[in-house]
């Protein structure tokens, strides 16, 4: 399955040392990657053409790239609503 456009947001601790969950929406379907399954978000991204979110360039993307140790968004178009 390929996802054209996916809206996403992450929830972290205040000092960003832990990712609680990542929530994505494609059409009217929600996908939730809780703390113990956050790593599965990378596989989800491999099927995604564009990610959309608010302040994802300034916050979400850097946090996730740091957590995974590389640019997990390298193959996605990025649209930030901020």
Question: What spans do the regions from the language model cover?
Answer:
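Long, highly charged low-complexity segments
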Residues: 1-13
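Conserved DEDDh/DEDDy metal-dependent 3′-5′ exonuclease domain
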Residues: 3-5, 17-19, 23-82
């Amino acid at each position: 399955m390929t996802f054209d456009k996916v809206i996403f947001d992450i929830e972290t601790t205040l000092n960003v040392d832990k990712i609680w969950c990542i929530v994505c929406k494609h059409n009217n379907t929600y996908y939730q990657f809780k703390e113990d399954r956050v790593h599965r978000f990378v596989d989800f991204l491999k099927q995604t053409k564009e990610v959309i979110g608010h302040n994802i360039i300034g916050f979400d993307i850097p946090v996730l790239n740091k957590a995974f140790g590389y640019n997990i968004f390298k193959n996605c178009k990025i649209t930030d609503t901020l």
